[in-house]
Design a protein with these regions (language model features):
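A short helix/loop element that forms part of the nucleotide-sugar donor recognition site in Leloir-type
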Residues: 141-155
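N-terminal strand-loop element at the rim of the active site
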Residues: 1-35, 127, 200, 325
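Aromatic "clamp/platform" in nucleotide-sugar-dependent glycosyltransferases that forms part
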Residues: 223, 242
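A short, active-site helix/loop in glycosyltransferases that binds the activated sugar's phosphate group
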Residues: 102-141
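Short hydrophobic beta-strand element within catalytic cores of glycosyltransferases
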Residues: 2-4, 250, 259-263, 268
Length: 330
């Protein structure tokens, strides 16, 4: 595993325990592109891996070029659709688009994520494949006993718990989420909002919570290693993203049987059950809030793991397919 950070990752311990190796490079800052390129050259000359599977779009042309020069089979993997911000799209395209001339194979979490990163031509080729972002479905299995136990553990008995899992970035649109939740609170006295994740905008979101006087209604739980429990703690999942490659947490929420109220940025491939409602971001917070509460009046929760398995999003299935793919290219 090759990371562009010196910070310990959430999965480092598990990777090392399973026998994996972790290498670190400096974060990409723009001005250090050529220094990183030289480091890539040195690294792949001394580490002759047979397959390199790249997940960092903007630098993928550089490190996959160096890997291919040392006889690696080069895979590039798109996990996100285009940003809604023009300058971000332009910069990303300039840095990443050359990978279409370098990579041997192209993966994406959805057709749209593939088209946005690689173009329409690539996604029609035989060396492109949608590789679903899978989960261990059974970890999210819902039961009323599990739900009530978690409610008691977190002191949320008698509360209607709205939940969100995601980094605090512009893409996740937490500000609008808080606007929606504020409108919900005006109509629902027992509403609570749980925010799971970290990110550069976390402090600014906390200030908004304070300014809205929602401090006793919103809890920040940081990064968690028990997301399946979080999904079983929640009563409602709300996801107001501006853009998403797929919307993987929406799949996790469906596995736990949650009613999911998401933005139209969520891809069709991520909707695998009949308890997801997509609302346009053009709607104001009042319309979101009223629509959510109206749907909840008639919702009956049940376990959703079979929906996930049927849709091919269970990790045990995908791990086998990816293993076969790697073995066929060694």
């Amino acid at each position: 595993f090759f990371f562009f950070s010196d910070v310990q990752g959430d999965y480092d311990e598990e990777i090392l325990k399973l026998g994996g190796e972790i290498y670190h490079m400096p974060s990409f800052r723009g001005y250090n592109y050529f220094d990183l390129f030289r480091k890539f050259q040195t690294f792949f000359e001394s580490h002759p891996y047979k397959i390199v599977h790249g997940h960092i779009g903007s630098l993928s042309p550089a490190y996959l070029y160096c890997a291919k020069k040392n006889d690696a089979f080069a895979i590039v993997h798109s996990h996100a659709t285009n940003s809604s911000i023009l300058w971000e799209r332009v910069v990303f395209w300039i840095l990443s688009h050359r990978v279409t001339k370098i990579a041997d194979f192209f993966f994406a979490c959805s057709d749209k994520a593939g088209k946005d990163m690689f173009g329409k031509k690539i996604i029609k080729q035989e060396n492109f494949k949608v590789l679903k972002n899978c989960i261990d479905a059974m970890e999210f299995q819902y039961s009323i006993e599990r739900h009530e136990k978690l409610k008691k553990q977190f002191g949320l008995e008698g509360k209607l718990v709205f939940g969100h899992v995601g980094r605090f970035t512009e893409a996740k649109n937490h500000k609008f989420l808080l606007d929606v939740f504020e409108s919900i609170c005006m109509r629902c006295d027992n509403a609570m909002l749980i925010l799971v994740g970290r990110g550069e905008l976390e402090n600014s979101i906390k200030k908004i919570v304070s300014n809205k006087k929602l401090g006793n209604k919103v809890q920040f739980l940081g990064v968690r290693d028990d997301v399946p429990n979080m999904m079983n703690l929640f009563d409602v999942f709300v996801f107001t993203s501006v853009f998403e490659g797929l919307g993987n947490v929406c799949i996790e929420a469906q596995a736990a049987g949650l009613p999911c109220f998401v933005s139209s940025a969520i891809q069709n491939e991520a909707i695998v059950s009949n308890h997801v409602w997509r609302f346009p971001l053009e709607w104001d917070n009042e319309k979101w809030a009223i629509s959510i509460l109206n749907h909840l009046k008639h919702f009956v929760r049940k376990d959703g793991t079979q929906d996930i398995i049927n849709a091919g999003y269970d990790s045990s299935q995908m791990a086998h397919l990816l293993e076969e793919f790697y073995c066929s290219h060694v």
